Amino acid sequence: MREFTLLRYLVFEGKAEAFAGLLYPLEKEKIPNTFSLTDNEKKALWLKIKPALQSDNWDILMEVMFGSKNYPNYGGYTLGVDIIQTAFKNHPEILKTNWTYLDAESFLKLSDYN
C-alpha cells in the first residue's frame, strides 16, 4: 500500500471538491475551504510546504489541511482545489477522461504547481 503523503492528501481533497463542484456548481461558493487564501497566501503556503510533500507525518498533514498556529485555516484544502483547477485549466482534455483515477504526481505535473 502506498503511503498517504501530504501531496496525496492535497490532491485527494482537491479531487473531492472539484467533483462536488461539477455536481453542484452553485454550492461551491459557499464552501470556505475552496477559496480561503489569496493568490499571494497560496504562493507563500506552497513554498512553505513544498519540502514536506512526501511527508506521511499525520500531525503535519492535519496542520496543513486544517490550519494551526503555523498554517492558515483550510490552507491545504485551498491548495488542493487549486492544484486540480489549474490542471483542468491547463489541460481541459482531462475533463473528458476518468480524471478521478489520475494520481497526485500526475495532477501536480499538469497544474501550475509543478
State what each model feature region is.
Residues 2-45:
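Post-HExxH zinc-binding segment in Zn-dependent metallohydrolases
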Residues 34-35, 46-114:
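Pan-zinc metallopeptidase signature
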